[in-house]
């Protein structure tokens, strides 16, 4: 778990395949280069057993429509170049989709249930991976988490990637305008079960700066 409150990027994080320009300031971490290159991940190389779930608060700060405009969560990231499965805001701020990096899109373009992702506003993104399927959802900060996953799929697009235990924050892929992505993240956690990745629990942890046994295990497992 990381609430990014100390203003220092954890030395355990890795930046692949392109480094981007990550800045931790004001209690958030941001990828501030609008054209960081395809692809740009902050990676937590944690050897997390599957299934596992990742949750994060996300805020799109700048956006230009285009195929390489994207941001979100990555799983089974390759230790060499961080290619993996991703749950992304993609192309437009009205579209969510699954990607197998550089191999194939799932082609499951889906509009968020609330319509459009607005720049400058916070949302929660949550996704889970197992050997059977990949799932993801997004909802506005301050609203109740939807019970159902927005996207669900078998790992059947672009060829099967091996489990790596590595997860990451996708900070964009654009190499040229008009596509661009500047994005911020906060309150990032990886959990053994989807039910443990609960915003109320995470925000309570942030408020008290005290980790329960479960969170302590997560914190020390990478």
Regions found by a protein language model. Give the residues of each.
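Extracellular carbohydrate-recognition regions
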Residues: 1-17, 199-203, 207-216
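Secretory/extracellular carbohydrate-interaction modules
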Residues: 32-100
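Flexible glycan-contacting loops in extracellular carbohydrate-active proteins
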Residues: 147-183
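Extracellular beta-strand elements of beta-rich domains used
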Residues: 4, 186-190
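Beta-strand-rich interaction surfaces with strong enrichment in secreted/lumenal proteins
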Residues: 40-47, 110-117, 157
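Short, aromatic/His-centered strand-loop micro-motif at the edge of beta-sheets
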Residues: 101-124
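Short tryptophan-centered beta-strand motifs in secreted/extracellular beta-sheet-rich domains
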Residues: 4, 54-56, 118-130, 134-138
